[in-house]
């Protein structure tokens, strides 16, 4: 049955705080994207290359969702939002390195296909190792590991790790997915 039209329902408390946090994080994310776009356009003198870098951030959110799914973590607006924003900086850095190397190869006279192949060859190890060590470093948080150095005890699932597990899962999943995209998709799109 429908409630009486004179009845007014207003959600407060945690729901209101989540909405405010989501609004703030969305504003921060869009502002960061705008500033990144301005810096990238001036750095590369190319709107296409700047959009290519920024598209990696959007694509990496798929990896964030996959990371949460694999680790069976709930979607928490605050920690996942912070994870996406933090991930944006890492993904942008990897793509800037690739595009800068590609542009230097083009200035040396290589055609676009050879420049993309050489870029992939030169930057595979640094990009992969950076991502691998970051994901490996996040694994204790992803696994909700709690280490007590005094009693030499390792436990899993401590309440203090609840928030960090979502954040670490978001960054680890997104970075893994984004690294694969960076190493495969970015050079392909640069050739176009």
PLM features per residue range, with description:
Residues 35-123, 128-148, 155, 173-177, ...:
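Hydrophobic transmembrane alpha-helices and their membrane-interface caps
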Residues 152-160:
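Surface-exposed acidic, glycine/proline-enriched linker/cap segments
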Residues 163, 167-168:
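Structured binding elements
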Residues 1-32, 41-45, 72, 113-115:
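Extracytoplasmic/periplasmic membrane-proximal domains and adjacent transmembrane bundles
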